[in-house]
C-alpha cells in the first residue's frame, strides 16, 4: 500500500525542475460554476422517446443546479431536470426532409425504445416540441405526462421580431453523429474523440493492410474497422451513422462487454487501445513515421529508494493514459502533482544494494510522452456496497505543460506542451447508469457537443464548466482537425465519384440519403473478414442491401490502386469498390474475392483465385472479367438446376417413383414419398445454395 508522508523528500529521481508544477492559467476561474452548467435533462437512465415530465417543470429554477438524483429501488425513476438559461441556443444538426427520410433498420427487438424522431425541432409547433432525455436507452423510464400549459413554459423566449428570426446555421467541419444502438453511448463518445484525433488519422493513412492482420483474430481487424469508421463519419452527406462493426464485436475487446448493457467508457477506451496496439505491432506496416502505438502510448519510470542506503532502483512501465485521483484535488495540475508525489511503502522490502529488509519510497514520473495524452479522472469509488460517483468539478486547462512531471527533458527537444481538443463527460449517479457524451475542439475557438446522433455548436466556457471524465490532449504543433477536414473533403468527394455503379444492389432508395448509414454486414459469428475487418459468413438476402443503382449484379472484386496520395489511403484502401458509398451498405470482402450475382432471391458465389486480382486493375479489364464471370455463373446455374434437366439423369430414385415422374403428368402433385426421394436426388446432384458458407 502506498502512503504519502509529509516528511519524505520531494523527489527520489533526478528531475529537470521541481515537482511543483507551474501555475496553469484556466479560463473563468472566478466565474460561478452554477452559471455555466449546460442543459442536463435527466440523470436517471430512461428511454429517449419519452416526453418531458411536466411535474418537474414547475419546480425548475433556471439559475440553480440540482443535486444528484436519489437512488430508487428498481430501474424506473422519475425525471430529474436540470436546466439554466443559455446565452445562445445551440445549433442543432438538422437534415432536410428530402435528404434523410429513410426508415431506420431495426436490428433487434431490444431497440424498440430507441428514438425514432431524428428530425430537428424547428419544423414542429412551438408548443409541441418533443424532448429527448440525455440518457441511454435500456433501463428505467421517465414519467409520461403531457400538459400543453406546462410545455408552453419551456418555450424559448421569442424576440420582438419573431417572424424574422434567423435560422441556425448548419454544423460543418466535424464528423457525423452516431446512432445509439442501445446503451452504446459509452462507445459513441469514445469514437467521436477518435474520429477527431489528427495523429490517429495520419497513422491510419500510412498503414498497409495485410492479410491476415496482426490482431490475433482473423474475423475482425481493429485498424481496418476504425479506418472505415472515420471515412464514413467524414462523408459530406452528414447523416448519422450506426457503428455496428464495434457494437456487434464488443466481446472481442473484452469478454465482460455485453451488447445493450451500459459499460464504462474508460474501460472500453483501454481495451480498444490495447487491441489497436496489437494490430499495429508491426511497424513495417506503416509507411510513415507515425504508428498507432506512437499516438497514445507513453512510458513511465518508477523509482524505489532504500531508506537505509539511499540506493535507487529504476524500472520502466508502459503507459496508455493516466488515471488520476480527484477526491482531494480541484485542478488537473494538482491531480498530476499527486500522481508524481513520493510515497512511502508500508511493506518492508529487501534492498538489492545493502541486502537489508528496509522501508522504501516510491515515485512515478513521466519518461516518454505520446502524441496524444489521455487523462482519466477517477469519478467512481467503491464504498463497500456499490460504485459511488464523485460529484466534483475539476478545473481543466486549455493548455498544459507536462515538463514538471517528467524525469528529464525529452530527447530531440520534443515539446512537452499540450492543448485540449476533446473530452468525455458522464451524466448519472453510477457507472452502470447514466449517459456519456463528448465535446470536440476542431479549431482554437470552435467546440461541438456530440450527444449520440445530435451534433451542436457549444460555447467554450460551457465546455470547461462540465464535470469531465476523460480528457484528450494533443502535443503542441499538432494540426487542428478543421484543417485536416478541409483537405480530406475533395478526396472524399472523389472517392464517391469513383465508386463503381455495379458495386450496389437494386433498391428503392433512388439515391436518397439514408437516415441511418450503417456499415454492418450480417451476423458476426464464424465468418471471414470483410473489407473493414468485420466477419461475414452468411450472405444477406437481397432486401437487406441498400443501393443507389438499378443494376442486378453485385461486384466486389479487389483491385489495387495505382496511385498514392497523402490522404488517399484512408479514402481508397486497397481497392476502389471497397470505399464507402453513401447511403449504401458495404458488402463483404473476404480473403478470397467473392463475386455474387442475384437470381431471384438466391446468391451464387464464384470464388476467384488471388492471382486474378491484378487483372481487374483497369476498367476495361474489369468489365471484361465481369462479363466472363457472368457467363460462367450462368453455366454454373444451369448445371446446378436439376429440375430443369431430364428426369432420367437423376439417379438414386426407385424405378417405380421414376416412372411416376417421367411418364406421369408433371403437373400432378407427387406423393409425399416421391417428393422426399426427389429432394434427396436434387440435394445429391446439387441445388442453389441458400447461404454462402466459406470454410
UniProtKB/Swiss-Prot annotation:
Signal peptide range: none
Region (Disordered): 1-20, 42-162, 556-585, 674-695
Entries under PROSITE patterns matching the protein: USP_1, USP_2, USP_3
BP-aspect Gene Ontology terms: protein deubiquitination; proteolysis
Keywords, alphabetical: Hydrolase, Protease, Thiol protease, Ubl conjugation pathway
Biased composition (Low complexity): 9-20, 61-86, 556-571
Acidic residues composition bias: residue spans: 112-124
Reaction(s) catalysed by this chain's protein: Thiol-dependent hydrolysis of ester, thioester, amide, peptide and isopeptide bonds formed by the C-terminal Gly of ubiquitin (a 76-residue protein attached to proteins as an intracellular targeting signal)
Active site: residue positions: 185, 435
InterPro entries xref list: Papain-like_cys_pep_sf, Peptidase_C19, Peptidase_C19_UCH, USP_CS, USP_dom
GO molecular function: cysteine-type deubiquitinase activity
Domain of life (superkingdom): Eukaryota
EC id: 3.4.19.12
Pfam families named among the record's database cross-references: UCH (PF00443)
Domain USP: 176-476
Described function: Recognizes and hydrolyzes the peptide bond at the C-terminal Gly of ubiquitin. Involved in the processing of poly-ubiquitin precursors as well as that of ubiquitinated proteins.
Family recorded in the similarity comment: Belongs to the peptidase C19 family.
Protein's recorded name: Ubiquitin carboxyl-terminal hydrolase 20
Record gene name: UBP20
Amino acid at each position: 500500500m502506498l502512503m504519502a508522508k509529509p516528511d519524505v523528500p520531494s523527489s527520489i529521481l533526478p528531475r529537470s525542475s521541481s515537482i511543483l508544477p507551474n501555475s496553469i492559467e484556466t479560463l473563468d476561474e472566478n466565474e460561478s460554476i452554477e452559471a455555466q452548467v449546460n442543459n442536463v435533462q435527466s440523470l436517471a437512465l430512461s428511454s429517449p422517446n419519452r416526453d418531458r415530465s411536466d411535474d418537474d417543470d414547475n419546480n425548475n429554477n433556471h439559475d440553480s443546479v440540482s443535486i444528484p438524483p436519489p437512488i430508487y429501488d428498481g430501474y424506473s425513476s422519475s425525471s430529474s431536470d436540470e436546466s439554466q438559461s443559455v446565452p445562445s441556443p445551440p445549433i442543432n444538426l438538422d437534415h432536410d426532409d428530402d435528404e434523410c427520410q429513410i426508415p431506420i433498420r431495426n436490428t433487434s427487438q431490444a431497440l424498440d425504445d430507441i428514438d425514432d424522431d431524428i428530425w430537428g425541432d424547428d419544423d414542429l409547433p412551438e408548443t409541441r416540441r418533443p424532448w429527448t432525455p440525455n440518457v441511454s436507452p435500456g433501463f428505467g423510464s421517465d414519467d409520461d405526462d403531457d400538459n400543453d400549459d406546462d410545455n408552453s413554459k419551456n418555450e424559448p423566449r421569442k424576440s420582438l421580431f419573431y417572424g424574422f428570426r434567423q435560422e441556425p446555421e448548419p454544423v460543418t467541419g466535424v464528423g457525423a453523429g452516431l446512432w445509439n444502438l442501445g446503451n452504446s453511448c459509452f462507445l459513441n463518445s469514445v469514437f467521436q474523440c477518435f474520429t477527431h484525433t489528427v495523429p490517429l488519422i495520419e497513422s491510419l493513412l500510412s498503414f498497409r493492410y495485410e492479410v491476415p492482420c496482426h490482431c490475433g483474430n482473423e474475423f475482425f481487424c481493429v485498424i481496418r474497422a476504425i479506418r472505415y469508421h472515420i471515412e464514413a463519419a467524414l462523408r459530406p452527406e452528414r447523416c448519422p451513422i450506426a457503428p455496428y462493426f464495434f457494437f456487434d464485436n464488443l466481446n472481442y475487446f473484452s469478454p465482460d462487454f455485453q451488447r445493450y448493457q451500459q459499460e464504462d467508457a474508460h474501460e472500453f477506451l483501454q481495451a480498444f487501445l490495447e487491441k489497436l496496439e496489437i494490430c499495429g505491432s508491426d511497424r513495417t506496416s506503416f509507411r510513415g513515421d507515425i504508428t498507432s502505438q506512437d499516438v497514445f502510448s507513453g512510458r513511465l519510470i518508477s523509482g524505489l529508494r532504500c531508506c537505509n542506503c539511499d540506493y535507487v532502483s529504476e524500472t520502466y512501465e508502459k503507459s496508455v493514459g493516466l488515471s488520476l485521483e480527484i477526491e482531494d484535488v480541484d485542478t488537473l495540475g494538482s491531480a498530476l502533482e499527486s500522481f508524481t508525489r513520493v510515497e512511502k511503502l508500508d511493506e518492508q522490502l529487501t534492498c538489492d544494494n545493502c541486502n537489508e529488509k528496509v522501508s522504501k519510497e516510491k515515485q512515478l514520473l513521466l519518461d516518454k510522452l505520446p502524441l496524444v495524452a489521455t487523462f482519466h479522472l477517477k469519478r467512481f469509488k467503491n464504498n463497500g456496497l456499490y460504485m459511488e460517483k464523485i460529484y466534483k468539478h475539476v478545473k481543466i486547462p486549455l493548455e498544459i505543460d507536462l515538463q514538471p512531471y517528467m524525469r528529464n527533458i525529452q530527447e530531440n527537444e520534443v515539446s512537452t506542451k499540450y492543448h485540449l481538443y476533446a473530452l468525455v463527460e458522464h451524466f448519472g449517479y453510477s457507472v452502470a447508469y447514466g449517459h456519456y457524451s463528448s465535446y470536440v475542439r476542431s479549431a482554437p475557438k470552435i467546440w461541438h457537443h456530440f450527444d449520440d446522433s445530435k451534433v451542436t455548436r457549444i460555447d467554450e466556457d460551457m465546455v470547461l464548466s462540465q464535470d469531465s471524465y476523460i480528457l484528450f490532449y494533443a502535443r503542441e504543433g499538432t494540426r487542428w482537425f478543421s484543417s485536416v477536414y478541409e483537405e480530406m473533403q475533395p478526396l472524399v468527394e472523389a472517392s464517391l465519384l469513383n465508386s463503381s455503379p455495379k458495386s450496389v444492389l437494386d433498391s428503392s432508395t433512388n439515391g436518397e440519403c439514408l437516415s441511418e448509414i450503417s456499415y454492418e454486414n450480417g451476423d458476426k459469428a464464424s465468418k471471414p473478414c470483410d473489407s473493414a475487418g468485420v466477419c461475414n459468413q452468411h450472405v444477406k438476402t437481397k432486401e437487406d442491401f441498400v443501393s443507389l443503382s438499378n443494376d442486378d449484379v453485385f461486384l466486389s472484386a479487389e483491385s489495387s490502386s495505382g496511385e498514392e496520395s497523402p490522404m488517399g489511403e484512408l479514402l481508397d484502401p486497397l481497392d476502389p469498390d471497397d470505399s464507402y458509398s453513401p447511403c449504401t451498405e458495404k458488402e463483404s470482402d473476404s480473403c478470397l474475392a467473392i463475386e455474387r450475382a442475384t437470381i431471384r432471391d438466391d446468391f451464387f458465389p464464384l470464388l476467384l483465385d488471388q492471382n486474378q486480382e491484378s487483372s481487374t486493375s483497369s476498367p476495361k479489364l474489369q468489365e471484361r472479367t465481369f462479363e466472363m464471370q457472368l457467363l460462367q455463373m450462368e453455366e454454373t446455374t444451369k448445371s446446378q438446376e436439376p429440375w430443369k434437366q431430364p428426369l432420367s439423369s437423376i439417379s438414386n430414385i426407385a424405378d417405380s417413383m421414376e416412372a411416376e415422374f417421367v411418364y406421369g403428368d408433371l403437373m400432378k402433385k407427387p406423393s409425399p414419398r416421391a417428393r422426399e426421394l426427389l429432394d434427396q436426388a436434387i440435394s445429391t446432384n446439387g441445388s442453389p445454395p441458400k447461404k454462402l458458407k466459406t470454410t
